[in-house]
Structure formats: structure tokens, C-alpha cells
Amino acid sequence: MAKPFKIIGLIGKQKDPRIAESLQQVADFLVAKGLTLMIDQETAALFPSHHWEAVTRHELGQRCDLAIVVGGDGTLLHVARSLADSGIPLLGIKLGRLGFLADVLPEALGTDLAAMLAGHYREEERFLLQAELEQESQSYLIGTALNDITTHIREVVRLIEFETYINGRFLNSQRSDGLVVATPTGSTAYALSAGGPILDVNLNAMVLVSICPHALSNRPLVIDADSLVEIVISEYNTTPGQVSCDGQPGIALKVGDKVKIYKRPGRVRLIHPTAHDHYSILRAKLHWGRKLG
């Protein structure tokens, strides 16, 4: 059994007053257990009359033993990026639809959550990707992603033309709607919708998936996660592109720009109930056939 948690940070889906009731339910449960509760400042805006200590996201990551995230996978992705340097474990209370990352239901607070707070849980680590942009002899860090980093066209439906390099070696040039570079965590997200494979979450790998490529020979490619992926916008490209991390607002790209994608130092810690089974989640969410007999 792991060490029980004592100081809990609570974070909710931003700018969504509908989750106030669920947040209150979780907060009341934690206080009833005699735990110290801190609340994220932005989340605190949903509780004008709250009496808990409101702290910045950074301070929450430094002072708390555990961060409980109330929302869906999108909320947990956002929190994972913002707390990536803290090393704090994350626990997701599922209010969204898919729930690949957040898997504790609000009605299971008295069972699953109580056991996890007492130290009965399973922990796994996921790596993140970092994106860097080289533009006009300048280099910029532009974002972090737990799921994927996507290069694509802005606003209009048109092909983008680019070249891809892996560890400095030319891979290919292509015309497509874009390219998704995904972690194992993100292999069940946009990359899957684009026709990519599902990667085991424990693999040290990432997958490159073309979005609607002009040439059908452009197939998904799984590579070592310690590789450096470079995407260079072709001189023949006529439409502005952009690069996005986990579906966040993108950074504009122009001819000659180079996007570098590589594994970010450090890992995200996720904790789950002891009965957590990733393959069971895949079967349920993707509607796979059950075992016969």
C-alpha cells in the first residue's frame, strides 16, 4: 500500500459553472475525511463564498500531495500540461464522455476515491512532447502536449506541403491535410481518428499519422520516442499553416519554418483505482467485441 494522501488540490473544468455541484460534492467528501483542501484560483471563481485556501496552479503543484481534477479528459490534459514540472500525481473525476484518462465516477467517491486517498491505487507514468519552432533564424518553445502535436492548414480546407525528418534524416515529403505526432496516450485521440494504430501506454514510442494524405502510400509510422521529428514547411506551400499542441490555439507557420518535436523531460503521474484495466477501457470506449463463451 502506498502512503495515504493528506493535502489535496482541487481543480475543475474552467469557465463551466455546470460542474459547481460536482466540485462541491468532491470538496465536501474530502473535508469530511479530515483532509486539508486547497483549490485552484481559477476554480475558486465558481465558488464565490468558498472558505478553502485558493492558490495558484504552480503553488498547488508544490504544496499538495495529490491533484484531483473534476471534468473530462480535456480538462485533465490541460492540468497535466500546467503541472508537468511539479511531479504531483493526478486523479481524474470523470464528467466527460470518453474517459480514457479520468476514470473515477462521481457516484464512486465513497468506494474508489476513498480507497485511493488511503493509498490503495495503481500509478502509471506518461511522457509528454515538446514543440519548438525555428523561424527566421530564431528558435521558440511553443508548447507541450500529452496527446499530440499537429501541423495543419489554418481555417480553410486545403492541402499543406511539407518535408519530414527523423533524427536529421529525410523521411518524406508529402501533401496532406496535416500530420499528427502522437504519444501512446494520444494514440486513442486525433491520431486514431486519422487512421493511426493504438499504442500500448507503456511503450516508449510515438506515432506519425498523416491526415488525409494525397498519396495513399503515406502510412502511419511508429518510431522511438527519443527521436527528434522535424517538419519543414515546403517552399511550394501556398497556404498558411499552423502547429497545435493538444488541440490548443495554434501558432502560425509560413514557408521555410521548421517545427521540432521531441520528448519532454519528466513525466505525468496518473493514479487509478486498483481495478483499473486499460484494455477494458479500450473495449468499452471503442465498442470492441467481448470475449466469447
From Swiss-Prot:
A GO cellular-component term linked to this record: cytoplasm
Domain of life: Bacteria
Keyword Lipid biosynthesis in annotation: no
Reactions catalysed: NAD(+) + ATP = ADP + NADP(+) + H(+)
Record-level Gene Ontology MF annotations: ATP binding; metal ion binding; NAD binding; NAD+ kinase activity
InterPro entries: ATP-NAD_kinase_N, ATP-NAD_kinase_PpnK-typ_C, NAD/diacylglycerol_kinase_sf, NADK
Enzyme class: transferase
EC number assigned by the record: 2.7.1.23
Any one Pfam family match given in the protein's UniProt record, by short name: NAD_kinase
Keywords per UniProt: ATP-binding, Cytoplasm, Kinase, NAD, NADP, Nucleotide-binding, Transferase
Signal peptide positions on this chain: none
SUPFAM superfamilies: NAD kinase/diacylglycerol kinase-like
Family per record: Belongs to the NAD kinase family.
Protein name, UniProt field: NAD kinase
Organism: Nitrosococcus oceani (strain ATCC 19707 / BCRC 17464 / JCM 30415 / NCIMB 11848 / C-107)
The organism's taxonomic lineage, starting at the top: Bacteria, Pseudomonadati, Pseudomonadota, Gammaproteobacteria, Chromatiales
